[in-house]
Design a protein with these regions (language model features):
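A nucleotide- and high-energy phosphate-metabolite-utilizing enzyme signature
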Residues: 1-226
């Protein structure tokens, strides 16, 4: 597809066309009315979670406004307890598939980036008055709406920012995951200083402890199936 065309700097956009509603057999683009009907009648919970990140970026103004309204309407509809049940099930499946990893696994695992983002997307879906898209704005909005306690929001904001800072630095410096045994002393010092830690060991310990606390917050907010 043209969206995934290779360029000198890599793929234009990494788009998996298999994720469109009709799979490999369906059209790449569909009518707005069909999109609205699919979201209202057929979409699964995980698709509505993904919709919390949607933004209209280009198009004729009337079409953009209509699409934005469809997204708002879908995310504003009442949700029953089955929505949280679906989210908890998704979280369990992700944990089983990805495992926990070590302190330098920034993206996957309990209390890491994807886990926190799943919580925030759930909050956005269950709190129609919160219209934010970015994680930082979502945390503030969900705390303001009372969906997150202030201390929970403060920890999630701080920890997510820390994880993303380390992730951005290591992605610029390395071709793969960070390993303190192989990354070199210069990168280790830079990472520690960027996070306000004395050394790389202290940063690793902080990431592990803060991830454990974030996971506990997520479990408290999402509840259980009992």
């Amino acid at each position: 597809a043209a969206l995934s065309a290779p360029t000198a700097q890599g793929l234009l956009y990494e788009v998996d066309m298999r994720l469109r509603p009709s799979g490999r057999q369906g059209p790449v683009a569909i009518a707005l009315s069909r999109f609205a009907r699919y979201q209202a009648e057929e979409a699964w919970t995980w698709e509505h979670l993904a919709l919390t990140r949607a933004r209209v970026v280009a198009g004729a103004p009337p079409v953009c406004a209509a699409l934005a309204q469809v997204i708002t309407d879908v995310l504003s509809r009442p949700r029953g307890p089955e929505a949280l049940t679906d989210v908890r099930s998704m979280r369990r499946r992700l944990a089983e598939a990805k495992g926990e990893g070590g302190p330098w696994e920034l993206k996957d695992g309990a209390g890491r980036i994807l886990d926190i983002e799943l919580l925030l997307q759930t909050g956005r879906m269950l709190t129609p008055g919160v219209q934010a898209v970015s994680p930082t704005q979502l945390i503030a909005g969900l705390a303001g709406a009372g969906w997150l306690a202030r201390d929970q929001a403060d920890h999630l904001r701080s920890h997510l920012g820390q994880l993303m800072t380390v992730q951005q630095i290591t992605r610029l410096a390395l071709a793969g995951p960070y390993d303190p045994q192989k990354g070199g002393p210069g990168l280790a010092q830079f990472l520690a200083e960027a996070a306000g830690c004395t050394d790389i060991e202290a940063l690793g310990a902080r990431l592990a402890a803060d991830s454990t606390k974030a996971a506990a917050i997520i479990e408290t907010v999402l509840g259980d199936d009992a």
